[in-house]
Amino acid sequence: MIEETLLEAGEKMDKAVEVAKDDFASIRTGRANPALYNKVIVEYYGTPTPLQQLASFGVPDARTILITPYDKTALRDIEKALSDSEVGANPSNDGNVIRVTIPELTKERRKEYVKIVKGKGEDAKVSIRSIRRKAKDSLDKLVKDGEAGEDEGARAEKELDALTKQHVDSIDELLKRKEAELLEV
């Protein structure tokens, strides 16, 4: 039972790190990155559809993203969705593909994004600590109910602490990398 609790906590912590990684990827750095458009929804034949299901992405240079729709009739809808998105880029449509030029970030905007990234990183750490707290409560209950010995409970708690530290450290590493990427001119 202890092993299942630790395994479940580890899986949930892995998921929290993945969510943080996705959140960080969706924050613009001034460099072309197709992940910026993961959350763009296109109104396609009346149905809200994620952009990555309608087009392929290419990055010909550091400031340009090339979006090639699988269905050319979706060009206008994709262009409208890109214009309306919060990414802050101006798409240009040449009839076959959409080119999105990523504007240079100002110093103030970079600092603003760093604050956002730190907030998302802190949210991820809080989530990991919450998972740890719930797992610890489960472990304590197992020991209290006599399903596990106190020594086993103490060993499992040490494992849980190591697991928590490992995941918090990986969030810190992701945070440090994203911050460096944002502040790089």
UniProtKB/Swiss-Prot annotation:
Q: Where are the residues of the annotated region Disordered?
A: 142-161
Gene Ontology cellular component list: cytoplasm
Q: Which InterPro entries match?
A: Ribosome_recyc_fac, Ribosome_recyc_fac_dom, RRF_sf
**One Pfam short name:** RRF
Superkingdom is: Bacteria
Which BP terms in the Gene Ontology apply to this protein? translational termination
Asked if the record carries the keyword Protein biosynthesis, the reply is yes
Q: What does this protein do?
A: Responsible for the release of ribosomes from messenger RNA at the termination of protein biosynthesis. May increase the efficiency of translation by recycling ribosomes from one round of translation to another.
Q: PANTHER family, alphabetically?
A: MITOCHONDRIAL RIBOSOME RECYCLING FACTOR PSEUDO 1 (PTHR20982:SF3), RIBOSOME RECYCLING FACTOR (PTHR20982)
* Name the record gives this protein: Ribosome-recycling factor
Name its species.
Answer: Paenarthrobacter aurescens (strain TC1)
The gene from which this protein is expressed is frr
